[in-house]
């Protein structure tokens, strides 16, 4: 049994794939070939966005979005700790500070009520309101030094790469922590769009830009609006395992803003201006390869049907596993792209036992994600837990807890994220998963005791 069956998909579209690839080989425009623009136009129309800008990966899409919004040192960017590292990584690469916000226990997406508290905490520099990272100056210095940027000190004692940067005064709105709330990146986890109505309202009240991380949700919907159409810029990934995936790395940004679209197109080609060798800003090498665009065009021809098939697979799981284990909840008005089908065990011991039982029965599983980002060594400088992540890892190992799981002895600053990290695991999910395979999975799981309801942990 495959966790994701790309071979079944390939068999369906092998002729179209071969034709599209052969066409690229014939015209030889491997960079910025016509297929790139064709794909951008097709996906912009599908999402309902004015502009689509292809790029080299989902990570590059997020990085380009923040660069277009001029996010940098002194800026606080809010996001969830329960996601893949790329979301917070790009914030750090630009010298900004990721401020983590806990998730909703039902949807696993960023909780708008917690976002409101986190913004208030940053504005007042008060971790009693909500957990905050350590001072921005120290975090920025550590992160920027790693990429060769040295912070300078201006006459007010503020640290910034440019002493004339207009952010210097505004950043002090965050008080001693030195952060200015600038943006929020909700993550559409497992294929389900976040609550953009509520998040957008919070962001609007505080003047924050919303950047949608739709890496897992392309094909999903929220109240009739497609994933990829929320926020000032939305970003998605075409990593092979995604609902719409290529045969390598690729990504895309979506926006309705003409100025931001122009900036994104410039940033992806080293900050290029109107002339090939006229560079008007700092950019990256983030172009979408023509071959990957051609592959995505072939896959997109059956993508709407595959999204419908994913709904059928999810419904079968729901029916087979009802009353056996905690299954995903899709709120009214939402449609998941079902990048993953994730379950909650009672605790990490039960999760490990269930995964072992499935493995012995020939069923692959995965954990997304075993350790929240604030516990990762890469973000040790944020010091959310009062210890470095390395110390926390050592403590965890010495207590023989589950490998990679958060240390239960440390303060649960983000209790929902940490609880989910100890309990969550995912089953095979793809459009070609047969009912017989799902019945086998359910049979392996149904001998466990009835599910105990999950209650929100108290902060």
Say what each PLM segment does:
Residues 1-68, 72, 93, 156, ...:
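Conserved PLP-binding active-site segment in aminotransferase class I/II-type PLP enzymes
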Residues 36-41, 50, 113, 133, ...:
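PLP-dependent aminotransferase class I/II
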Residues 1, 75-76, 208-209:
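Hydrophobic "anchor" residues on beta-strands that sit immediately upstream
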Residues 29-76, 90-94, 99-102, 124-154, ...:
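Phosphate-binding glycine-rich loop
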Residues 83-88:
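Conserved coil-to-alpha-helix start sites within the AMP-binding
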Residues 106-246, 252-254:
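Active-site phosphate-binding strand-loop segment of PLP-dependent enzymes
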């Amino acid at each position: 049994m495959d966790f994701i069956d790309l071979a079944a998909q390939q068999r369906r579209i092998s002729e179209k794939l071969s034709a599209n690839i052969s066409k690229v080989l014939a015209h030889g425009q491997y960079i910025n070939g016509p297929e790139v623009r064709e794909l951008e136009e097709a996906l912009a129309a599908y999402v309902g966005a004015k502009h689509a800008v292809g790029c080299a990966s989902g990570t590059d899409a997020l990085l380009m979005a923040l660069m277009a919004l001029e996010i940098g040192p002194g800026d606080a960017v809010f996001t969830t700790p329960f996601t893949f590292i790329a979301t917070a990584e790009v914030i750090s690469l630009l010298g900004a500070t990721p401020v983590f916000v806990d998730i909703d226990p039902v949807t696993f997406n960023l909780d708008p009520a917690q976002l409101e508290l986190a913004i208030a905490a940053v504005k007042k520099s008060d971790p009693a309101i909500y957990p905050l990272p350590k001072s921005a100056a120290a975090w920025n210095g550590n992160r920027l030094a790693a990429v060769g940027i040295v912070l300078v000190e201006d006459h007010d004692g503020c640290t910034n790469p440019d002493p004339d940067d207009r952010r210097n005064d505004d950043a002090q709105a965050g008080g001693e922590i030195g952060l200015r709330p600038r943006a929020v990146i909700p993550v559409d986890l497992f294929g389900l769009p976040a609550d953009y109505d509520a998040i957008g309202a919070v962001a609007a009240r505080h003047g924050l830009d919303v950047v949608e991380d739709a890496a897992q949700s392309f094909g999903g919907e929220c109240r009739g609006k497609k994933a990829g159409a929320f926020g000032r810029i939305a970003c998605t990934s075409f990593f092979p395992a995604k609902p719409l995936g290529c045969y390598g790395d690729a990504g895309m940004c979506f926006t309705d803003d003409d100025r931001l679209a122009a900036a994104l197109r410039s940033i992806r080609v080293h900050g290029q201006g109107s002339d090939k060798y006229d560079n008007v800003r700092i950019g990256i090498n983030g172009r979408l390869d023509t071959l990957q665009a051609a592959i995505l065009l072939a896959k997109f021809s059956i993508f709407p049907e595959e999204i419908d098939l994913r709904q059928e697979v999810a419904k079968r799981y729901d029916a087979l596993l009802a009353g056996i284990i905690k299954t995903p909840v899709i709120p009214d008005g939402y449609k998941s792209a079902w990048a993953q089908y994730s379950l909650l065990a009672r605790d990490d011991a039960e999760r490990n036992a269930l995964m072992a039982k499935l493995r012995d029965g020939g069923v692959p599983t995965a954990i997304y994600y075993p350790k929240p980002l604030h516990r990762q060594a890469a973000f040790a400088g944020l010091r959310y837990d009062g210890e470095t992540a390395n110390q926390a890892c050592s403590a965890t190992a010495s207590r023989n807890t589950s490998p990679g799981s958060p240390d239960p002895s440390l303060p649960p600053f983000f209790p929902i994220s940490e609880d989910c990290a100890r309990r969550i695991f995912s089953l095979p999910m793809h459009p070609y998963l047969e009912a017989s395979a799902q019945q086998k999975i359910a049979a392996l799981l149904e001998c466990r005791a009835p599910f105990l309801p999950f209650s929100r942990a108290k902060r």
